[in-house]
Amino acid sequence: MSSTLGVMLKELNPALSVQLFEVTEKPAQEASNGWNNAGTGHAGICELSYTPNQEEDGTVDVSKAISVFEDFEHSLQFWAHTARRGIIKDTRKCLNSLPHISLVHTQEQVPYLKARYEGLKKHHFFEPMRFSTDRKEIADWAPLLMKGRNEAQPVAATHMDGGTDVNFGEISRSFCQWIDEQENCRTQFGHRVVDLNKKTSGKGWIVTVRNEKTCQKQKIHADFVFVGAGGGSLPLLQKSGIPEVSGYGGFPIGGQWMISRNPKVVAKHTAKVYGQALGAAPTMAVPHLDTRMIDGKQSLLFGPFAAWTGKFLHNGGSHFDLPLSVRPGNILSLMRVGMHNLDLVKYLVEQGLQSKESRMRELRNFYPDARADDWEVIDAGIRVQAIKQDPGEEPGIVHYGTEVLTSADKTISALLGASPGASVSTQVMLECIQRCLPQFLESDEAKERMS
C-alpha cells in the first residue's frame, strides 16, 4: 500500500519529495511477501466470503463481489501503466493468469452456489462464468478436486478464466526500487518509526525514525504521513494521538500454509479454488487450494490455518504488541472481543494445536487423494483485524475488510484491516489522495494521467 501511494503521488507530481521507511532489511518481508499471503487477485470471482448469505427468497446478494471486481480492475490497469513506464520490469514475475474456481461439497451448499452463480451472471463482469454439478466437467477444470472423491458426495463448482495469481512482494519491490531512484525520494530499510508528533505551528508532523542497527534517531518533517505498516499501523496511530483512533483495537490472527512442491502433484492443478469458511473461521481462513508462481517456480498451496498470536507483524513484531496496544479508549472493545467471539477464540486455539494429520483431513475436502508425504507446513503472514465500536453496535465486534482511517485535518492517514487488501490497493490509495491530497488531482496533467 505504501509503495503504491508513493508511486502514484510521484507520477502525479514529479517534484514531490517522498520518503519511505521500513523496519525490515528488505522490502516486502511482511504481509506483501509472496509466502505470507495467498497471492489471489481478489476479484470476487471465487471468494465466497464476499457473498456469504443466501436470502430467504433463495437469492444471493452479489453487490460486494461486483465492487471488488471493479476495484481489482483498477489495480490491473495501474500495474499495466507501471509496466509501460518501466516501473515493473517483468510482469511475468508478478502477474499470472489462472482460472478461479469456487467449490462446495455438501447438500446445503449446492443451492447456494447455484444462486450465487445466477446472481453474478447477470452482470457483464461475470458473463464467462460457468456452473456445474457434473463431476467429469469439474475434473476437467481441476483434476485433483475429483480424484478419489466419494461418488455419493454432492459437489458443485463455478469456473471462470481470467483470474489472477499475484506476487505482491515482487510488485512492492519494483515500486520501492523505482521510488528510491527518483529525485528527492528515498527508501530506507532497517529503520523503525518510533514516534509521531504533530507540529506545534502549521500543519504536518515530526516523524522520529530509529536506525535498527545503530539505534541512532533522526527527525523528519512531513506535510503528510501515510502509515502503511500492516499490523503495525495501529500502534503508530496511537502514538500520533489523533482522536480518530480512540476506540480502535487490533486482533492479530496468525497463519500457516500447507504447500506441495512435488512436480507430479503440482502439474495436475492449475487454478485457484476457494471453498466456504467452516463454523467460526474468520474471513482470512476461508480454505483454498491454489497454484502459486513465486520466483519463477510453481507450487501448490492449501490453507490458511489460523492461529492465536500476540504479534502484529510477522518479522518486525513482538509478542507484546497486543498487550501494549491496550488503551483506555479501546480496553472495553478488546475485553468484549472474547465475550462476543468465543467461537472465534476457540477456533484459533484449536487451529494452532492441529496435528499435520488433522490438517490433511481438511485438505482432503478439496483433494481427496492427498498424501501427507507430498506436503509440508510453513508459516504464513499475520493479519490484524480492526476492532471498533460503530454507532448502534456493541463494543468488541471484529471487523473484516480494508479500512482507511484519516485525521480531521487530513495530514495523516493509515490503513487498517486485511482482505481484499493489496488487491484493491490502487482504488484505496486513490481514495486516500482524493480525501487528503486532492490538490494533486486538480491539474490538467494529473487528470490526463489518471484517465
Residue ranges of predicted features:
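Short beta-strand to alpha-helix junction loop
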Residues: 63, 67-76, 104-111, 158-178, ...
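Flavin (FAD/FMN) cofactor-binding core of flavoprotein oxidoreductases
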Residues: 132-143, 250-256, 261-263, 336-416
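Conserved beta-strand-loop-beta-strand element in the redox core of flavoprotein oxidoreductases
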Residues: 194-220
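Glycine-rich FAD pyrophosphate-binding loop
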Residues: 10-34
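Flavin (primarily FAD) binding-site architecture
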Residues: 227-243
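Dinucleotide-binding Rossmann-like beta1-alpha1 core, especially the glycine-rich loop
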Residues: 39-140, 299, 311, 317-321
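Flavin (FAD/FMN) cofactor-binding and adjacent substrate-gating region
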Residues: 90-97, 103-177, 182, 186-188, ...
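Short hydrophobic core segments
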Residues: 21, 193, 219-232, 429
